[in-house]
UniProtKB/Swiss-Prot annotation:
Encoding gene per record: xseA
Originating species: Aliivibrio fischeri (strain MJ11) (Vibrio fischeri)
Family from the record: Belongs to the XseA family.
Any one GO CC term of the record: exodeoxyribonuclease VII complex
Upper classification of the organism: Bacteria, Pseudomonadati, Pseudomonadota, Gammaproteobacteria, Vibrionales
Subcellular location, principal: cytoplasm
Reactions catalysed according to its record: Exonucleolytic cleavage in either 5'- to 3'- or 3'- to 5'-direction to yield nucleoside 5'-phosphates
GO process annotations (BP): DNA catabolic process
GO molecular function: exodeoxyribonuclease VII activity; nucleic acid binding
Protein's name according to its UniProt entry: Exodeoxyribonuclease 7 large subunit
EC number per UniProt: 3.1.11.6
Keywords assigned by UniProt, alphabetized: Cytoplasm, Exonuclease, Hydrolase, Nuclease
NCBIfam families: xseA
Amino acid sequence: MSLDSNPRIFTVSRLNAEVRLLLENEMGIVWLVGEISNLTVPVSGHWYLTLKDSQAQVKCAMFKGNNRRVTFKPQNGKQVLVKARLSLYEPRGDYQLIIESMQPEGDGRLQQEFDQLKMSLAAEGLFAQTAKKTLPEQPKRVGIITSQTGAALFDILHVLKRRDPNLPVVIYPTMVQGSGAAIQIAQAIGRANSRNECDILIVGRGGGSLEDLWCFNEEIVARTIAASEIPIVSAVGHEIDVTIADFVADVRAPTPSAAAELVSRDLSAQLQTVAHQKRRLNSAMERYLSHQQRSLSAYQHRIEKQHPQMQLNNQSQRLDDLNQRLMNHIQQRLQRQQYRVENLTLRLNNLSPTKRISQDKLHIEELKRRLLDSMDRNLLMQRHQLALAAEKLDTVSPLATLMRGYSITHNQDGKVITSTKQVELGDNITTRFADGDITSTVTKASELS
């Protein structure tokens, strides 16, 4: 027996390993329809079976981690659709399939179509988040695309009436199951876009089997949803039901009722929020007004203390006080003089000589006259000094200055204007006269040359 030069020689185990790698790497994932036979379930929990048709068979294994996700009970003789990868059991050299998922043949075929369309549309970018449109915060009109006799429509309308009874609704009736349903759904979406009377659409129906919901997995529905200029909320079946329409829609709601919750405002909650904000605003306004009132009272008190009339009143009161003190001083002096006269009279009365008495009387009368004259002069002088003091006070009085034809001008901040440099053209200024105020606008300002 002759050998080629440098032949590649395998061991059996090496050959089986190479073949296993070749099968797994080259063939990849396959979908296979067949009938179950020779099903065994050892204590490990793995499944071992044979898939066959009328002409051939292949050994299969489905490990515990994958078979626990199977939703039906496999039995010998049952037709199934499996997703598997090719492999080789090296110890025996047996070619086999490692099953990753298993479904009854009917459901499995639909699931395969679902997965293929999903992958195709995803590759085109129809599921991308950047393609999603933002839902309006407060829709003005909601469109509903569903069966007009289905429970889904009742659920949606019930929720909308409870949350926002004034929200207008437009119903676009369509089939949602069976032959021709997908075309009708696509036409309803197109009709809603052409009429452009709604700013958000709910597309959906109630729960059902995979076949019942299949129209929402059709490519025509998916592409029509993606092309819609109006944002669409999908609401197909129950929370566990997932359709191609859910992936393409701008937002997916788990149920029709949840979709109605999503697109509507809860008016009662909003009214409560508005009432709370109103109470907070009123409280803040009351605090602000109270603070401003206290500040205003303080400013008013300070202004009143500095007001010319207040200063005039203070000066007038001081004059009254000085006048009263002067009158008291004169009265005390008169009383002392009167007391002295009475003492002298008493002393004279105690002297017996008549001549002395007469002379003393004359002297007393003279003294009395002189005293009265002196008192009159003194009183006149005091009154004259008081009048002079009053005139001096009057000359410095702001009110007297105003009475002589002068005026005082303030700017908008209440500050006295003493120079033309303190005003700008267009400023509003207030001029005070003795009998009132005049408000004027500066149209010209010039300095004395």
